[in-house]
Amino acid sequence: MIIGIMKTFLLTICFLSVQTGMVAIAQDKEQTPVYLDDTQPIEVRVQDALNRMTVEEKTRLSYAQGKFSSPGCPRLGIPELWMSDGPHGVRAEINWNDWGYAGWTNDSCTAFPALTCLAASWNPLLAAKYGYAIGEEARYREKDVLLGPGVNIYRTPLNGRNFEYMGEDPYLASELCVPYIQGVQKNGVAACVKHYALNNQELWRGHIDVQLSDRALYEIYLPAFKAAVERGKAWSIMGAYNKVRGTHATHHKLLNNDILKGEWNFDGCVITDWGAAHDTYEAAMYGLDIEMGSYTNGLTSESEFGYDDYYLGKSYLKMVREGKIPMEVVNDKAARVLRLIFRTAMNRRKPFGALTSEEHYRTAYEIATEGIVLLKNGTGKKQPALLPVPQGKYKRILVVGDNATRNLMLGGGSSELKVQKVISSLDGIKAKFGDGVVYAQGYTSGRPMYGRADVIPQVTVDSLRNDAVEKAMNSDLVIFVGGLNKNHFQDCEGGDRLSYELPFAQNELIEALLKVNKNLVAVIVSGNAVEMPWVKEIPSIVQSWYLGSVGGEALADVLSGEVTPSGKLPFSYPVKLEDCPAHFFGEISYPGDSIRQEYKEDILVGYRWYDTKKVQPLFPFGYGMSYTTFEYSKPVISAQTMNTDGSIDVSVKVKNTGKVAGKEIIQLYIGDEECSVLRPVKELKDFRKVQLLPNEEKEVKFTIKPEALQFFDDKQRTWVAEPGKFKAYIAASSSDIRGTVTFEYIQ
């Protein structure tokens, strides 16, 4: 009896406790502001927060509070945003008010290969892995916005920042940036796609005024940004330094209001490049949402707490109070910043991230090995192929070159990285080929300084060259590892290359080495094409890139044949600089007259120019050799006509006819045979990367839709596909056509 009473009593207590808890939870739910309730849709939360904020709080969201931070709304418990460079790795911590490094001991990162290497891989699956891995590192470091990827088009090989971008073709850049962005943002970190738009040179980047046609703008320079927004769903965009048609790009009505936020329905934030804003009214009215700055007032001085002096600081608030800036503009800006904060800093469902994990190093290795491009490998009996280099074949291997030992993560401007580990080219080659490897520096390039370059004494140049030549005489194989580096006036932010040739007397060194040893493999480390006056004399040439933390291991595995090279060039290699379309028209086209420049080549950028003008490049776009060979069947088309709502399939069989496994990149180009306006001979519209074992054959099918036939009609301001005949090219590169089919488009 007593036991029964006790049970009843305990059950009653439990029931009352549960009821009380449920009531408390319900009350808490009712008391939680909507903007803090992450079960609510983001747009509902944004509107609720806006309704609670003062004008001062709304405008304060739009400018920096530190070098890499912008504020939230402390009164409402809305946190600040933290940003970080860059597209290849998460940059070490920077001081609050200056550009000095903070000296932390826990901010080392994985250096991933530069984006030119990713572009050379032609592998969207790797782009997704890249984005997710770098996003994990940013998340672990508690960053909300990762300042990348860069998708500016490769217009000239002199651009100091080409290594950060994805080549000359808008379709290739689009297909790779989308999975990269999606990968980053799965971590609750915003990708900030840059530099919007037309920041295609570093020289005079802060003020050069770009003049171009609407066709060039829409067909060449905007597609990757459009893909980033519409397909990648990028949460932020970085405005560029340069002017476009007289107005700074970072607050530009056509670019930001009409195209980005109008035509593409972008709902994220436009963030300045650091110090890129120049006018309060334009910044407010023409689409800028967050202003960041190189200096604490955004322009000139190093005052300690001058953030209110930014163009979107107190001047912006004053204009709002005076009625010069409508409140709908203020609310739109604030809503965009809040939306970004809710997606990142206030996203409680984001993962914890990871830093310098083995998985990240493996991803970096895969990108590096798939991006390395074999440019040349013998020409026959008189010049036999030197690659791959079997282990044990050569007793003495000489590695020559400053880049073989240089830490190529240093320098370059905002892409500079502090890495946990780095495997240099020499380290990788020694680990692969053993004690028979010796080293000679051969040349020196000086310190990786920003804004200036070391002057190398001639006595040093001669001494290093003589030492390398002497060692080459007594070596069985010479591997030259040279090219460019991250020094100023090379592959570096803030300045362009001064010439197309290799710097630091490398051409003279290569010629001297060839005179004493013909068994020479040249490995060119760069993010740009370089002049090669010795190209016919060297048996084997490899285009390496800035390969990141484990680049030396990746390079050694490709040289040895453990990995078969499968990269293909994401840009054309001109024989001489004047062959490049940006340079064909003289200084007004590049670099401009210091105030203004005209893109006179119009839509004929890269291979579009070489094809149309019948100029032979040194190495064409989409080109890359392998240690195996591939045979293409005759392509088959599914129909001879296509209507406005139809499509056509083009199929081709590809067979590995060599003795080792390899990967081939099959490229589809489309040419308009009958058009009322100038169009290139052909344009890349699709590609596939397939892996094939020896004697294995696979069928690749491409589906062509009317969108692939279109050009931008600048009179109607719309995309148009004119009826008529079209040709589909199946190719191994833009110059290596393996088959064609024709069809007619009918409206």
Swiss-Prot record:
Q: Where in the cell is it found?
A: Periplasm
Instruction: List the top taxonomic levels of the source.
Output: Bacteria, Pseudomonadati, Bacteroidota, Bacteroidia, Bacteroidales
Name of the protein this chain belongs to? Beta-glucosidase BoGH3A
pH behavior is given as: Optimum pH is 6.0-7.0.
Pathway assignment: Glucan metabolism; xyloglucan degradation
Q: Which UniProt keywords apply?
A: Carbohydrate metabolism, Glycosidase, Hydrolase, Periplasm, Polysaccharide degradation, Signal
Q: Which Pfam families match?
A: Fn3-like, Glyco_hydro_3, Glyco_hydro_3_C
State the superkingdom. Answer: Bacteria
Query: Where are the catalytic residues?
Result: 273
Catalyses which reaction? Hydrolysis of terminal, non-reducing beta-D-glucosyl residues with release of beta-D-glucose
Main location, first listed in the record: periplasm
Q: What Enzyme Commission number(s) appear in the record?
A: 3.2.1.21
Main function: Catalyzes the hydrolysis of terminal, non-reducing beta-D-glucosyl residues with release of beta-D-glucose in xyloglucan degradation, leading to remove the backbone 'G' units.
Q: What else is known?
A: Gut bacteria supply the human body with energy from dietary polysaccharides through glycosidases that are absent in the human genome. Xyloglucans are a ubiquitous family of highly branched plant cell wall polysaccharides present in the vegetables we consume. Enzymes involved in xyloglucan degradation mediate the conversion of otherwise indigestible plant polysaccharides to short-chain fatty acids.
So which residues are the signal peptide here? Answer: 1-26
Does the keyword section mention Signal? Answer: yes
Any one GO biological process: xyloglucan catabolic process
Annotated Gene Ontology cellular component terms: periplasmic space
Q: What class of enzyme is it?
A: hydrolase
- Note the InterPro entries from the entry: Cellulose_deg_GH3, Fn3-like, Glyco_hydro_3_AS, Glyco_hydro_3_C, Glyco_hydro_3_C_sf, Glyco_hydro_3_N, Glyco_hydro_3_N_sf, Glycoside_hydrolase_SF
Task: List the molecular function annotations (GO) for this entry.
Answer: beta-glucosidase activity
Give the species this sequence originates from. Bacteroides ovatus (strain ATCC 8483 / DSM 1896 / JCM 5824 / BCRC 10623 / CCUG 4943 / NCTC 11153)
Q: Which SMART domains match?
A: Fn3_like (SM01217)
Query: Which family does the UniProt entry place this protein in?
Result: Belongs to the glycosyl hydrolase 3 family.
